[in-house]
Amino acid sequence: MFLEEKLNLVWNKILEEVSKKISPQYYERFIDTLKLETINSEKCTIIAPSATIKTHVERKYQSIIENAILETCGDKIPVEILIETKAASPLQSILEKSFDQKDFQFNPDYTFETFIVGDCNRLAYTAAKECVRKPAEINPLYIFGSVGVGKTHLLHAIGSELTKKDPWKTVCYVDISSFMNEFRFALQSRELIESFKIKYQSYNCLIVDDIQLLSTNAEKTQDEFFALFNFLFERKRQIVIASDRPSSELAIHERLKSRFVTGVQADIQYPDREIRKGIVTHHSKIMDLGLSEDILDFLADQIEEDTRLLLGALNDIYLYKKSYSLLFLNLDKVKEIVKNRLYRKKNIEFSHDRIIEAVAKEFNLNTAEIMGKSRKKELIIPRHICFYLLHNVFNVNKSQVGRLFQTQHTTVIHGVRKTEELLSNNKEMRFLVERISSKYKLQ
């Protein structure tokens, strides 16, 4: 056992070696807070002031400390890090508990191998694979698309593959609502804010979902996320962001938007027929449903909006077969089982026609003119109003609107924006849109 009076001398020599391997900023934040408790030929015990510091040092610097001990003492001595026994505040304990949890557990079913690739999602899939192959080469990766198109699947695939590739690297998956709530909680004290910063700055990869929920009202949260983004970006840490809309449509400060466009923006469209058929075929095999080709075709043809609706239909079929101990089902029975999932689709198609007819009538046009390709001014405004009504009022996805009018997704975005500008300045047009909205939202 080393004598008590020699502990400080030995510790200072160890710290001197450690300081050669770590930047001054991190040395001051993490290493300088540690204390040497005991050291002998069997074990070196070090005290950390908090669970946050302990976890971070164990993840990032323990091997550096052990090598410094070898350099100083000539022996390879294992290091044990303990937490100082002073009473922690209840708030600090809560935050440290969240930091001390195991890394996020990614869904094992959401892998690159199980992701059905087609023209609607190929760019996002390729970019996601590249994030794993060469982290931070594409940075950030911004994936956007409507609900149920596969964004979450790709996020989990990226996280799980990065973890498999290098188990020592830490990956954080967080939805922006959780990030905002955690940050608001941390604002209660300087100590909590410091722990919050340490937590998020420690990750090698940050995956953020639902970024569209970050609004301009959350000034401090935006500032914190902006600082975190820059911190990770400058250190070439991979950042992946998912949203239901392009970054240009986010209600956030321009400086954040400008960061998001520095990498790749990958749009995932609603799955085409080929992709839908691939999804139902793949999952029906996994679930051992034994569905015939005509049933698979029916499901792929009838459920277009959302892959989750497809999977929900398969779950309905599975439960029905299990409940009645059936080996096979015919097409008529499947139609009966999933009829409630098809009802929504029929209603949406019905609304399309009614809304377009209503707009055409207001402008003394016919629907064929509005649905056509003509660029005449007297047709563009009504067409844009249709875009606006279908998307903003009746919640039809922009990709669906684009398919309905046989135009590009970006054209729909432009049309919706132009209509929003028009309505803010033109009282007559605003009344027209409100009249159509109120009439058909009640039906």
UniProtKB/Swiss-Prot annotation:
It is found in: Cytoplasm. Residues 322-443 are annotated as: Domain IV, binds dsDNA. The gene is dnaA. Plays an essential role in the initiation and regulation of chromosomal replication. ATP-DnaA binds to the origin of replication (oriC) to initiate formation of the DNA replication initiation complex once per cell cycle. Binds the DnaA box (a 9 base pair repeat at the origin) and separates the double-stranded (ds)DNA. Forms a right-handed helical filament on oriC DNA; dsDNA binds to the exterior of the filament while single-stranded (ss)DNA is stabiized in the filament's interior. Its main location: cytoplasm. The keyword Hydrolase does not apply. Keywords: ATP-binding, Cytoplasm, DNA replication, DNA-binding, Lipid-binding, Nucleotide-binding. Belongs to the DnaA family. Domain I is involved in oligomerization and binding regulators, domain II is flexibile and of varying length in different bacteria, domain III forms the AAA+ region, while domain IV binds dsDNA. One of its GO terms (molecular function) is lipid binding. Disulfide bonds: none annotated. The keyword ATP-binding applies. The lineage of its organism: Bacteria, Pseudomonadati, Spirochaetota, Spirochaetia, Leptospirales. HAMAP family: DnaA_bact. Coiled coil: none annotated. Signal peptide: none annotated. NCBIfam families: DnaA. Residues 105-321 are annotated as: Domain III, AAA+ region. This is Chromosomal replication initiator protein DnaA. One of its GO terms (cellular component) is cytoplasm.
